[in-house]
């Protein structure tokens, strides 16, 4: 797909926007499992399927001919598994992403885990990610991106909420 240029960013989603947003997609975590654990499990399954191995039994009466054997995820993109970026909101999920060989996408959605200034926490998240990557023994170099959400102020209400004019706003 796209000549090997496709980069895919995924995460469990920003938790503050919708209460139990996963339910709107018919996902309900089993008893004793959090929505975050469910999302990580689904991600692990997805990563395995990206390797291109057959997993699904073909329909004996398909609309068009199938290749022999189990069917893989299509369209298949060689190397896409190495071009997956995990949007980590915590240090623990950054380390988890590193262990699984995903690239790290850090942003302003990082959760405050220590009360330290944001830039200190984000730098620590990246250090922990790189250490976990090294410990996992991956052959390739880890990739990290840092993004920041920017919102245009278009009216007086926006300015009232977001244009405080100090270092905090």
Predicted regions and their residues:
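Flexible, glycine-rich active-site loops centered on histidine and acidic residues
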Residues: 1-55
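Active-site-proximal loop/turn and secondary-structure-junction residues that shape catalytic pockets
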Residues: 12-16, 110, 148-152
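Active-site glycine-rich loop that binds ribose-phosphate moieties when present
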Residues: 63-72
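A local structural motif
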Residues: 77-83
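A conserved active-site cap/scaffold subdomain adjacent to cofactor or substrate pockets
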Residues: 92-120
């Amino acid at each position: 797909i796209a000549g090997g240029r496709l980069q895919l960013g995924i995460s469990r989603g920003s938790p503050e926007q919708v209460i139990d947003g996963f339910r709107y997609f018919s996902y309900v975590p089993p008893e004793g499992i959090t929505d975050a654990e469910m999302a990580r499990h689904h991600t692990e399954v997805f990563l395995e399927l990206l390797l291109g191995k057959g997993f699904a039994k073909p329909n004996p009466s398909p609309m068009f001919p199938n290749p022999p054997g189990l069917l893989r995820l299509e369209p298949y993109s060689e190397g896409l598994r190495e071009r997956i970026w995990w949007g980590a909101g915590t240090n623990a999920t950054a380390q988890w992403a590193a262990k699984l060989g995903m690239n790290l996408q850090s942003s302003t959605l990082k959760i405050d885990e220590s009360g330290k200034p944001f830039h200190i926490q984000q730098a620590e998240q990246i250090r922990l990610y790189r250490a976990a990557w090294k410990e996992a023994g991956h052959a390739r170099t880890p990739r990290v991106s840092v993004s920041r959400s920017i919102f245009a102020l278009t009216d007086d209400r926006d300015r009232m909420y977001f244009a405080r004019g100090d270092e905090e706003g």
